[in-house]
Amino acid sequence: MPDSTIPLLCVLGLLALSSACYIQNCPRGGKRSFPDLKRPCMSCGPGNRGLCFGPSICCGEGMGCYMGSPEAASCVEENYLTSPCEVGGRVCGSEEGHCAAPGVCCDAESCLLDSDCLDDSKRQPPSEQYSSLMEGLAGDLLQWMLHATRRERPQ
C-alpha cells in the first residue's frame, strides 16, 4: 500500500468518528431517529380521575394530589415508557410546573402551593371549593383530628 494512503485513511477515520452522536446530545433511538411525539400522561388515582405528574405524584381536579401513596403507584410506569408525556394545564412555578389542582403547582419532582393555580377555583361558590377537602385521605385525617380534640381529656 502506498505511503500516501495511510494519512488519507487516518483523516477519513477521524472524520467519521467526529460526526458521531455524543452521549450528551443523542436523541432516544440514535441520531437518525424521529423526534419523540408528546402523548398525554397516564391516568391514576381513584377511578383514574387524576394524571401522573412524576414517578410518585398523582393529581386531579376535585381530588387533590397523592404523593408516594398507593394511588400514585401506577405513575412509576411512566419511567419505563420510551416517549415523553405532556401534562395539560397552565404553566406555573419556576421548574416547568403545571397547575395540577386548584392552588397546587406540580412538576416531576414535587408540588407546591401556587396562587397562579387558583383562578379556576375562584369561580366556584365557596361551598363547592371546600367540598373536595372533605373527600379522601385529607377529609379522613381532618375528621380524625376533630374527633380527637372532642374526646374527654384526663383531669
Curated annotation (Swiss-Prot):
UniProt keyword annotations, A-Z: Amidation, Cleavage on pair of basic residues, Disulfide bond, Hormone, Secreted, Signal
Record has DNA repair as a keyword: no
Signal peptide: 1-20
Subcellular location: Secreted
Source organism: Oncorhynchus masou
Gene Ontology MF terms in the entry: neurohypophyseal hormone activity
Matches recorded under PANTHER family: NEUROPHYSIN, VASOPRESSIN-NEUROPHYSIN 2-COPEPTIN PRECURSOR
Protein name in the entry: Vasotocin-neurophysin VT 1
Annotated Pfam families: Hormone_4, Hormone_5
Glycine amide carried by residues: 29
